[in-house]
Regions:
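A structured binding-face within diverse protein domains that lines the active/interaction site
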Residues: 1-175
């Protein structure tokens, strides 16, 4: 499960969701793709993302993200919010499953040498605006947030190449 902040019926909720977006309209959840990334450039067009983009945006808390053996974090090591989409699938028996994915964009100059995409990072202070469902004008106002975060307040550290043999060794990768 992934921790996500969402707004529903005017109230913000923190909840655990399954990673990989399962659209609410899917008939058979076992046969449906469950993307973990949604490209910012196509979220308004693709059927899987169109509804969540309009009504179900979420925030995913993070202290860093990984790309090709590197950890990218804020220089001050503070938490930040990744832009996400969520949806609720309701089964024939009434059971509910909430799922989410992260929105990606082109990379900034720090991430570009590592990968051609990076997560969308919501600018500090704009979290509530991101969560607010809205009409076309509101969504168009969100589009500037879908661009790469500036490289300056970020830091990129190479991780040790060896994979951990057990859970206790994982922390040593960051030494």
């Amino acid at each position: 499960p992934v921790l996500a902040m969402r707004r529903e019926h005017g109230e913000d909720h923190l909840s655990h969701m399954l990673w990989g977006l399962l659209p609410g309209w899917v008939k058979d959840p076992l046969q449906a793709p469950r993307p973990i990334n949604a490209r910012a450039e196509t979220i308004a067009e693709k059927a899987s993302f169109r509804g969540p983009w309009r009504h179900h945006r979420c925030l995913l808390p993070s202290t860093g993200f990984f790309e090709k053996g590197h950890l990218i974090q804020r220089k001050d090591r503070q938490m930040f919010w990744l832009a996400g989409l969520w949806d609720r699938w309701i089964g024939p028996d009434g059971s509910e499953v909430e799922t989410c994915c992260v929105i990606t964009t082109r990379p900034n100059s720090l991430v570009a040498p590592l990968h051609d995409r990076m997560p969308v990072i919501i600018p500090e202070g704009l979290e509530s605006i991101w969560l607010e469902p809205g009409d076309g004008a509101h969504r168009r106002a969100l589009e500037p947030m879908l661009t790469p975060a500036p490289a300056e307040p970020w830091d990129c550290r190479a991780l040790k190449p060896a994979a951990p043999a057990n859970r206790h060794q994982q922390l040593s990768l960051l030494d």
